[in-house]
Amino acid sequence: MATSFASEAAHIREIGHLSVPDLARATGANETTVRAWLRDERSPSGGHAERLAELSSLVERLVRVMEPAYVPVWMRKPIPLLDDDKPLDVIAAGEYRRVSKVLAGLEASGAV
């Protein structure tokens, strides 16, 4: 039985071209757990659900300012405005607002 959070994992994967390892890295879940979410066998909860919701918000914004196929590249790149941290790692640490601020700059400029 699918839940909203499990459906969100599939949505993020589809629109943002993120892999199972990317979703696992950002949410702090293991890859087996993420695959279970994608098969609607389990549902994210607690911190995993929070990280997934944050990732979803960011991915939905990212696809408006860059090609969707570039999203996974950008999420794995060291970003100078994040002190050369990678967005996936910043999200995993619960600091998605840092990524959101960088993204706001991209939104203001129109594109990457």
Q: Where in this protein do the model-derived segments appear?
A:
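Non-transmembrane "mature" sequence context
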Residues: 1-112
